[in-house]
Design a protein with these regions (language model features):
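Core residues of bacterial helix-turn-helix
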Residues: 24-25, 36, 43, 64
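The N-cap/first-turn positions of alpha helices
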Residues: 2-8, 29, 61, 89
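Interdomain hinge and pocket-entrance segments immediately C-terminal to HTH DNA-binding domains
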Residues: 83-92
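Regular, well-ordered alpha-helical segments
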Residues: 11, 23, 41, 48, ...
């Protein structure tokens, strides 16, 4: 399960537009900006830049996107494996 900030990051990577990512996630554009700024501070680098009014990913953003995509795929695989093996019941 990804953190809401990393989900925001992945949405921005998908549409390459803060406003469209906000609409996709049903949050405000300033919230998207805050999430990206948090991640930039956390990792100590810029994730996106503007070139000629176009949003582009930095190399760090590409690395993070690749990593998070892998995490999402593995989580989906695990969910399916648990679902298909009938391991839904949690006993305490």
């Amino acid at each position: 399960m990804l953190d809401h900030r990393t989900e925001t990051f992945m949405a921005v990577c998908s549409v390459m537009n803060y406003r469209e990512a906000a609409e996709l996630l049903h949050i405000t554009q300033p919230a998207v900006t805050q999430h990206i700024q948090f991640l930039e501070k956390e990792y100590g680098c810029r994730l996106f830049l503007y070139e000629n009014r176009k949003l582009i990913k930095t190399p760090a953003a590409q690395m993070l996107e690749d990593y998070l995509s892998s995490v999402q795929q593995r989580e989906n695989f695990l969910r399916e494996k648990i679902k298909n093996n009938g391991l839904r019941e949690l006993r305490i």
